[in-house]
A protein has these predicted regions:
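Class I S-adenosyl-L-methionine
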Residues: 1-36, 42-46, 62-66, 86, ...
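Generic structural signal for well-ordered alpha-helical scaffold segments
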Residues: 45-53, 78
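Short helix-loop-beta connector
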Residues: 52-62
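Conserved SAM-binding loop of SAM-dependent methyltransferases across substrates and taxa
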Residues: 70-87
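Conserved SAM-binding motif I beta-strand of class I
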Residues: 91-96
């Protein structure tokens, strides 16, 4: 089982990956500005591997990361899984509306020599992956993007849908005084997540 300590141990040996995606600086030191992101990714991976680890080695496991942004998550998962066996080659689709981040992901993929990753500019809800997807992922996808990831996972029949929502900018303004859910937003962290 991959616990947090083991995941971090693997990542400590992956300087090239972590530097390429900006979680470490060239000296091998963790980027303090990205420490929170690193911790979120490690935590997400710990939960992800608890759920999928026994399934991953059975066949070519396909991931779809929705609203992938800079795709830290897919790059980290790819590097962790590739450390177990040369025969264990997952496949990743990353989709995001932002052309700039998709272009950066394509460059990083090329630098790292990852031929098992594709990055697509577009909307999650309109995208149909060319292969069957085993796991749909979303980490801090904003507004309705988490909902779209869940809907896409159901639509394409993914066995696993693992998401961590972000801020709900469209819902928060609707929780006005007198709304039955207003009490949920008394605590700032809940109000903005």
């Amino acid at each position: 089982m991959l616990d947090k300590g083991y995941i971090e141990q693997i990542l400590n040996s992956k300087n090239e990956v972590l530097e390429s995606i900006g979680l470490k600086v060239k000296s091998g030191v963790y980027n303090r500005n990205k420490q929170k992101k690193y911790d979120e990714i490690v935590g997400f991976c710990e939960h992800l591997f608890k759920v999928i680890f026994n399934e991953v080695g059975k066949k070519r496991f396909v991931f779809l990361e929705c609203s992938c942004g800079k795709s830290y998550l897919s790059f980290v998962i790819n590097s962790i899984l590739s450390s177990f066996s040369e025969n264990l080659i997952p496949y990743f689709y990353g989709i995001d509306k932002n052309r700039n981040v998709i272009e950066k992901c394509v460059k990083i993929k090329s630098v790292l020599g990852y031929s098992n990753m594709e990055f697509i500019e577009g909307n999650t809800i309109n995208y149909t992956p060319p292969r069957h997807v085993d796991a749909v992922l979303a980490l801090h996808a904003c507004d309705t993007a988490t909902d779209e990831a869940i809907a896409k996972g159901i639509e394409i029949g993914a066995k696993f849908i693992i998401v961590v929502p972000c801020c709900q900018n469209q819902i928060r303004p609707q929780l006005k005084s007198g709304h039955p859910l207003t009490a949920l937003t008394d605590f700032g962290l809940l109000r903005y997540r």
